[in-house]
Amino acid sequence: MIGRQLIQLLQHRHHELISVRHDKHPGEFKQISNRAGNTVFVRPDLVRGTLEQAYALYESLARGIKRSIFMMFVISEIHPFDDGNGRIARIMMNAELVSAQECRIIIPTVYRDDYLLALRHLSRSRNPDAYIKMLVRAQEFTASIDFSSYEKALQQLRQANAFMQSFEGKLIF
């Protein structure tokens, strides 16, 4: 898929994700710079070009986990929208996995701090090891859950502490 088509798909999925939040401009790239703490994301006027450059690299990667990990980071790092950037990054990541018939990745509540710290570490250090390890562990966790019934999945998620805050417990599986 060429960069332009992938950008259109990203915008379409974002529109679907937050379509009821008109004030957040569903499917439209940001017009005002955004930040999280000390992290300043890509300037609005550079979003499209940065995505196009990133997608050129994306196409060189093998389908599946490699592309999904890259996709997740690119969208998280660019933060192309006013809102919903983390959610759309995870949607795009999982779409890559599904298209390669690989297990999706769920980031349970208890693992959220690990997830954010690994993203921040990669952004600041340019060392992807912790980020890759975190996502592989999350995928292994997701694969360990039996989703054949709601009751089974819910029980396993509770046993794994998935719904706890990180200060209340750790992910167990």
Q: Predicted regions span which residues?
A:
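FIC/Doc superfamily catalytic core
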Residues: 1-173
